[in-house]
């Protein structure tokens, strides 16, 4: 590649890895560059790499590495760095997601609304996110391929693998639903087990204090409907050797340190300080900074409780851990026999006895198991003694085996707690495994870990290669096999039999006398020429392997010890015979073959290899998805990016390997629109007229004589370096064009300045000459004229002085004479007028003052007395009327008592022929009747007393009227006194006297007013007493009803009642009917016959079945009428809903509102709900919104509460009291008097009003949600329109303003048409404007939310051209809002504030000059800093290539956002949808106009029903009060 001056490049630098530079001078074999560190560097061309400019990347960064023009190592590194500085922690590399640990909370990225945004979205359509990868795996598993998926999360310790795994599980739980029959989600259950797994599987390493020393594969299981049905945790590759051997400054597994710090529990297990145990004191690091071992111990125990491990098992687990620690302290010395061993001393014996006690096994058997082994032969069992080294190895093998079995038991129990679905056919597995490791000293553990990563990298390479080939196939391009570096040779080196490193290591471990020197020698001898294996210079036993991520040197000192892992039958027999069920359960009995070989060799590396093979088989059976976690710095600090560390991780994570695979094929790919838009300047003649983008792309490439390209269906594919050639040629053309334009422009500016200067000089010269000539002529003319002027002036001055002197003398004389005369006359007139004015004014002032005082005093006194008198008169009249009504009721009661006596006489006659045994009951009934008569007499006497009290009140009222007459007479007398006082001569004295008199009268009047107020209070007390007496009478009547009910039951039980099939009503029923109280029986809801009807029907004989059938038939007919009104569309008359009016009329006529118990309201609500559940419910929603709101307003305005809510003894002041208060004063909500009759409502009617209110809210919410669902696809099309149409219109795409997207205006027109159709539908159904206004407002709020969130989630939407496009669409919506007026649109335009301000920010020019305050206060006052920061980080100018906001403003906003995140002030930059109901019942009553239902005619379909014939006979039914 040739380099020219001014080219942007990358140059390698030791400290930073790569730095930005610009070519200053290009020579044949050397290039001089100027770096960003302000240094001139001379390097060879091979060490330079081309760099993308900010203009090329669109904002300085891309969200997918494949979009980089120059896909190379520094380009990937610095793209991640720029995005990390903007808190954009996720970046794609094709289908691979790179996640950089932010080391700070970013809650706005992980809330439920964000999960909803990524649900069902194609990968790459929104900004990179871990939710997108999780959704891609879920969609392919459940929707597209029906194949199990896997998500491989890798990275070094501290890169955020565990947190990423949690987020993936959280999203899968969100889209897959909750686990069956469990309140906790699978994600919660798995996370609850994390503290337990971390305690037993995590340890401190060199780089991380909490490093997972095992691989975890979480398998989320789904049923056929895509819902989560179970989960399982699979663990792989536990680092067992860490139990017995660690290096400084690392630690053993956390659980050992927690147990030693557990206080009393540690004493129970005879544990001491950490440093006293061999398995722990090999490292000097015992505690972790910021972690308390004792607190972590209790957290682990709580995790065991949550998982469901019993207290007994917990105790057994910790006893087993303590036993392992005690095992490590057992030391051996040579025994009496050769090659034998024994326990060293008493200390070792103490630990042995303690371990045996904790294992609950025999101590002697434990000693023999450690110091000897048994060999089964045909002749018998041979016991062989072990030397000290073999005994120690035997001890460590036992400790590792016990710990491994314990860890497997924990995982098994956790899986039982979570719950697995064995019938599940689809799974999504999430793999969290340790990443590639390369330390200063690398041992056997790093060898195994890197071997696993080599396997995973091979799987990763195959997947990346496969994805590349799939894209080539989908684009139908001609391609050949891509050559890329395969790591199969490394895998063969490690695992191939029989001469792989693992095989050689196992062979060396099988020989007791083998050492690491013999192992290294044999390895170098077998692989002396292998390209991947190297011998180190400074050590004969160390070796170096060239892994995919770089070279790693391993020290073989402890390879053999860590690899040996014998399966000893004696170990299993020892612990399986333990008296502890838990320990014996860990070791099942061995089969016969294993017993014969009691000391079977099993290497850690071989088992590691088998587990890895099983893992790879699982992964190969699934479709993989990759998440590479990156740790930006070793200090775990936010906003710190260490280039070298990240570069090393990119290499270890295989990201750069994926880049290399892409470079081997066609790494650069562009859509035809993007390619033409960028490189059309190379062949401008092809842009004349209409053209095909694909053919134009081909023409450009052929014109440039490029051969390494392929034309796909939608993209052009270019080999590495081809895009650089095109960019160089494009840059040359643009440079030449720029120079040509600059030359012409300079010529134009220079000529323009010269012409302007010449014209100015000529004008100045002419002006100067004219000025001189005019000045000379003026001097001469002025000199000649001056002589003549002087002559005439002197004469005129003298004459004028003489005339002025004469006139002045005459004028002074006449003025003095007149002045003296006028002054004299004025003085005389003023004295006279002053006298008159003073007298008149003094008199008038006191008269007015007196009249004002007198009139005000009298008016106030009279008005107040009249008001009090009228109020008292009304109260007395009301009390009198109530007493009269009560007396009338008592008279009626007496008449009814006579009727009852007549009835009893008739019953006695009929019972004369009955059995003598019934006579006793008749006597009892007579006594009851007599007692009732006595009570009625008492009630009558009480009524008489009330009448007497009424007469007393009437007398008091007359006294009050007399006082009012006296006050009026006093008023007349005061007026006469005022007239007499006006004629008094001495106004001052008379007014003073009168004022004192008036003050005395005022005092007297106040006293009389106080007396009147006391009397009124007494009257009010008497009224309250009367009210209490009425309440007592009401209670007595209730008791009478209860007693008569008992009497009726006894009478019905008599045999003679068969002859009385039509009996009169009971006393309580007749009394209720006489005073207008509704009956409490359900069958008497619609009519209330009088007692005379029953008496008249005594001679008749009606069958019992007919009498019971009539109300049921009438009830069924009424129910059918209501169903017909609800199910049929009765339409409207004069804008009034017919169905609502008919239903209300029927309910009024049937007295449903006055019933204490009825089911008709439930039938109405149920029928409406049934209609709304049908298939055509969406189309009928506006119709029923209009009807239900009209019915609700009729109820609100015409129902009022009765005594049920006003009597304190009946109801408390709770919710019903509030409802009653609302119904008592409907004018409070209406604001005007209603001509419609008011109906006293009972509790069912009040409940019906509440149900109807809920129904209106439900219909409104359902209609709103349906509209949102319908408009969402239209909005999505509008969002995608700029992306699909960009560049399709050739030169038109470069135009400015609204015309930038002429092809997309139809999408906005579709939204406008949708709104027009909605308005027509609502108006056709006469939906009140109040509902339309609320509905349109919430719909525009939804439009604002959708457009704004899309702007913040899609980088291609956050561009200059897209801002113009959205702005044009918003102008159409503004026009629509203006057309429909504020009556229906309301504040809809205000609801679009967020998207309007965001779009306004996108399309302004010179953004770099804007300060943060200007942006916050002027441009985007409604947006939060987090939202503005998100727009600034996503924005790029795709039209003019200008830069965005200045780096200083971005840095200030980033600091504010970070501070905001720490304080948890706001969690998201996205807007939430408002699902609330934006109105209340009071709002409806105030906003909806009154409805006159009188002129609504009965539809023909209902006229044949007898129950509604009243609607044909009368226009305005008056309900019975």
UniProtKB/Swiss-Prot annotation:
Keyword NAD tagged: no
Q: Name one GO cellular component term.
A: membrane
* Region of interest called Actin-binding, as start-end residue ranges on this chain: 493-527, 529-552, 587-612, 612-634
Q: Which InterPro entries match?
A: Dilute_dom, IQ_motif_EF-hand-BS, Kinesin_motor_dom_sf, Myosin_head_motor_dom-like, Myosin_N, MyosinXI_CBD, MYSc_Myo11, P-loop_NTPase
Domain Myosin N-terminal SH3-like, by residue range, is 4-53
Task: Work out whether the entry's keyword set contains Zinc.
Answer: no
- In what residue span(s) does the IQ domain sit? 733-755, 756-778, 781-803, 804-826, 829-851, 852-874
**Keyword line:** Actin-binding, ATP-binding, Calmodulin-binding, Coiled coil, Cytoplasm, Motor protein, Myosin, Nucleotide-binding, Repeat
Query: Matching SUPFAM superfamilies, A to Z?
Result: P-loop containing nucleoside triphosphate hydrolases
Q: Could you give the domain comment from the record?
A: IQ domain mediates interaction with calmodulin. The tail domain is a globular cargo-binding domain.
What is the protein name for this chain? Protein OPAQUE1
Which gene is this protein's source?
Answer: O1
């Amino acid at each position: 590649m040739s380099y020219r001056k001014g080219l942007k490049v990358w140059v390698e630098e030791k400290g930073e890895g790569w730095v930005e530079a610009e070519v200053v001078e290009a020579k044949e074999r050397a290039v001089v560059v100027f770096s960003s560190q302000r240094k001139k560097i001379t390097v060879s061309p091979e060490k330079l790499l081309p760099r993308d400019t900010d203009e090329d990347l669109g904002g300085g960064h891309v969200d997918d590495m494949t979009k980089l023009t120059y896909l190379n190592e520094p380009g990937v590194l610095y793209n991640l760095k720029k995005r990390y500085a903007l808190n954009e922690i996720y970046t794609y590399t094709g289908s691979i997601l790179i996640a950089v640990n932010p080391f700070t909370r970013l809650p706005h990225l992980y809330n439920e609304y964000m999960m909803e945004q990524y649900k069902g979205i194609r990968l790459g359509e929104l900004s990179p996110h871990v939710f997108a990868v999780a959704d891609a795996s879920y969609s392919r598993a459940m929707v597209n391929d029906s194949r199990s998926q896997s998500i491989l999360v890798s990275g070094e310790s501290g890169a955020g693998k565990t947190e990423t795994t949690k987020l993936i599980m959280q999203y899968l739980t969100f889209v897959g639903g909750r686990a069956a029959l469990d309140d906790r989600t699978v994600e919660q259950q798995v996370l609850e087990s994390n503290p337990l797994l971390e305690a037993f599987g995590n340890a401190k390493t060199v780089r991380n204090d909490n490093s997972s020393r095992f691989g975890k594969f979480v398998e989320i299981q789904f049923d056929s409907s895509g819902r989560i049905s179970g989960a399982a945790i699979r663990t792989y590759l536990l680092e067992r050797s860490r139990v017995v051997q660690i290096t400084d400054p690392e630690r053993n597994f956390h659980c050992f340190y927690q147990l030693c710090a557990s206080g009393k529990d540690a004493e129970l297990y005879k544990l001491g300080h950490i440093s006293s145990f061999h398995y722990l004191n090999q490292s000097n690091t015992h505690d972790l900074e910021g972690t308390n071992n004792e607190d972590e111990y209790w957290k682990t125990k709580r995790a065991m409780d949550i998982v469901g491990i019993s207290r007994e098992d917990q105790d057994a687990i910790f006893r087993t851990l303590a036993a392992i620690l005690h095992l490590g302290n057992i030391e051996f010395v040579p025994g009496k026999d050769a090659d034998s061993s024994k326990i060293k001393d008493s200390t070792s014996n103490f630990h042995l006895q303690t371990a045996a006690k904790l294992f609950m096994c025999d101590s002697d058997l434990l000693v023999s198991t450690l110091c000897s082994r048994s060999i089964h032969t045909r002749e018998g069992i041979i016991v062989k003694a072990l030397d000290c080294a073999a005994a120690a190895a035997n001890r460590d093998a036992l400790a590792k085996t016990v710990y491994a079995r314990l860890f497997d038991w924990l995982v098994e129990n956790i899986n039982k707690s979570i719950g697995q679905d064995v019938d599940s056919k689809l799974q999504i597995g999430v793999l969290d495994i340790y990443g590639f490791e390369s330390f200063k000293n690398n041992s056997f553990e790093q060898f195994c870990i890197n071997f696993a990563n080599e396997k995973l990298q091979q799987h990763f390479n195959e997947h990346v290669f496969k994805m590349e080939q799939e894209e080539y196939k989908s684009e139908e391009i001609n391609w050949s096999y891509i050559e890329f570096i395969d790591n199969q040779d490394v895998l063969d080196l490690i695992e191939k039999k029989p001469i792989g490193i693992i095989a050689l290591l196992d062979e060396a471990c099988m020989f007791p006398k083998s050492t690491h020197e013999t192992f290294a020698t044999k390895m170098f001898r077998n692989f002396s020429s292998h390209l991947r294996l190297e011998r180190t210079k400074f050590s004969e036993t160390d070796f170096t392997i060239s892994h995919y991520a770089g070279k790693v040197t391993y020290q073989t000192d402890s390879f053999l010890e860590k690899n040996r892992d014998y399966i000893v039958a004696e170990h299993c027999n020892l612990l399986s015979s333990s008296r502890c069920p838990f320990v014996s359960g860990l070791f099942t009995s061995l089969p016969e073959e294993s017993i014969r070989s009691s000391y079977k060799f099993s290497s850690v590396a071989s088992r590691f290899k088998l587990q890895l093979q099983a893992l790879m088989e699982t992964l190969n059976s699934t479709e993989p998805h990759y998440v590479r976690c990156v740790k930006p710095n070793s200090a775990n600090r936010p906003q710190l990016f260490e280039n070298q560390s990240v570069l090393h991780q990119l290499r270890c994570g295989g990201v750069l390997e994926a880049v290399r695979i892409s470079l081997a094929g066609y790494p650069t790919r562009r859509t035809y629109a993007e390619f033409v838009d960028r490189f059309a300047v190379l062949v401008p003649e092809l842009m004349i007229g209409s053209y095909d983008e694909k053919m134009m792309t081909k023409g450009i490439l052929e014109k440039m004589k490029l051969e390494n390209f392929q034309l796909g269906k939608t993209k052009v594919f270019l080999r590495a370096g081809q895009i650089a050639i095109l960019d160089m040629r494009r840059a040359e053309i643009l440079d030449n064009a720029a120079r040509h334009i600059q030359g012409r422009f300079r010529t134009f500016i220079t000529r323009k300045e010269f012409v302007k200067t010449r014209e100015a000089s000529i004008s100045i010269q002419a002006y100067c000459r004219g000025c001189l000539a005019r000045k000379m002529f003026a001097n001469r003319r002025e000199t000649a004229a001056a002589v003549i002027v002087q002559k005439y002036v002197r004469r005129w001055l003298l004459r004028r002085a003489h005339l002025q002197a004469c006139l002045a003398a005459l004028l002074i004389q006449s003025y003095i004479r007149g002045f003296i005369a006028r002054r004299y006359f004025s003085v005389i007139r003023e004295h006279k007028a002053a006298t008159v004015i003073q007298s008149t004014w003094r008199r008038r002032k006191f008269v007015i003052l007196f009249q004002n005082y007198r009139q005000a005093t009298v008016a106030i006194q009279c008005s107040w007395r009249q008001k009090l008198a009228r109020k008292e008169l009304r109260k007395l009249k009301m009390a009198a009327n109530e007493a009269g009504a009560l007396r009338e009721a008592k008279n009626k009661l007496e008449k009814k008592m006579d009727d009852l006596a007549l009835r009893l006489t008739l019953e006695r006659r009929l019972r004369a022929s009955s059995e003598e045994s019934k006579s006793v009951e008749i006597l009892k009934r007579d006594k009851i009747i007599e007692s009732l008569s006595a009570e009625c007499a008492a009630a009558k006497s009480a009524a008489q007393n009330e009448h007497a009290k009424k007469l007393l009140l009437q007398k008091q009222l007359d006294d009050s009227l007399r006082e009012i007459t006296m006050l009026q007479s006093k008023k007349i007398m005061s007026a006469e006194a005022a007239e007499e006082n006006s004629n008094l001569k001495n106004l001052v004295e008379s007014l003073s006297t009168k004022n004192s008199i008036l003050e005395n009268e005022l005092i007297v009047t106040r006293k009389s007013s106080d007396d009147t107020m006391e009397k009124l209070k007494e009257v009010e007390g008497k009224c309250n007493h009367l009210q209490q007496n009425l309440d007592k009478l009401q209670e007595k009547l209730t008791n009478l009803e209860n007693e008569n009910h008992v009497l009726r039951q006894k009478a019905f039980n008599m045999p003679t009642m068969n002859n009385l099939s039509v009996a009169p009503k009971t006393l309580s029923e007749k009394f209720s009917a006489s005073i207008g109280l509704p009956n409490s029986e359900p069958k008497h809801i619609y009519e209330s016959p009088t007692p005379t009807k029953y008496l008249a029907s005594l001679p008749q004989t009606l069958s019992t079945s007919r009498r019971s059938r009539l109300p049921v038939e009438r009830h069924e007919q009424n129910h059918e009428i209501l169903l017909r009104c609800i199910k049929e569309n009765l339409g409207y008359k004069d804008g009034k809903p017919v169905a609502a009016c008919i239903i209300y009329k029927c309910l009024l006529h049937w007295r449903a509102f006055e019933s204490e118990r009825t089911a008709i309201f439930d039938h109405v609500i149920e029928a409406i709900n049934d209609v709304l559940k049908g298939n055509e419910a969406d189309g009928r929603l506006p119709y029923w919104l209009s009807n239900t709101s009209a019915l609700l307003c009729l109820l609100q305005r015409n129902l009022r509460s009765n005594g049920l809510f006003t009597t304190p003894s009946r109801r408390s002041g709770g919710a019903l009291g509030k409802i009653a208060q609302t119904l008592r004063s409907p004018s409070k909500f209406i604001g005007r008097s209603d001509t419609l009759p008011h109906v006293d409502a009972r509790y069912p009617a009040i409940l019906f009003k509440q149900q109807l209110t809920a129904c209106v809210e439900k219909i409104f919410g359902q209609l709103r949600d349906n509209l949102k669902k319908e408009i969402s696809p239209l909005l999505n099309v509008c969002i995608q329109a700029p992306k699909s149409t960009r560049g399709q219109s050739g030169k038109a795409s470069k135009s400015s303003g609204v015309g930038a997207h002429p092809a997309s205006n139809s999408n906005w027109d579709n939204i406008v048409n949708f709104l027009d159709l909605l308005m027509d539908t609502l108006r056709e159904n006469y939906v009140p404007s109040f509902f339309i206004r609320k509905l349109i407002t919430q719909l525009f709020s939804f439009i604002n939310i959708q457009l704004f969130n899309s702007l913040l989630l899609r980088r291609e939407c956050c561009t200059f051209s897209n801002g113009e496009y959205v702005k044009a669409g918003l102008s159409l919506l503004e026009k629509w809002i203006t057309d429909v007026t504020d009556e229906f649109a309301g504040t809809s335009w205000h609801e679009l504030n967020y998207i309007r301000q965001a779009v306004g920010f996108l399309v302004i020019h010179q953004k770099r000059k804007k300060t943060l305050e200007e942006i916050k206060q002027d441009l985007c006052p409604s947006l939060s800093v987090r939202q503005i920061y998100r727009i600034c980080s996503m924005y790029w100018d795709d039209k003019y290539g200008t830069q965005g906001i200045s780096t200083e403003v971005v840095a200030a906003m980033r600091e504010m956002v970070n501070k905001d995140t720490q304080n948890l002030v706001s969690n998201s930059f996205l807007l939430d949808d408002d699902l609330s109901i934006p109105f209340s019942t009071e709002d409806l009553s105030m906003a909806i106009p009154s409805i006159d239902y009188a002129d609504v005619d009965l539809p023909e379909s209902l006229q044949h029903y007898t129950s509604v014939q009243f609607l044909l006979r009368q226009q305005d039914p008056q309900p019975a009060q």
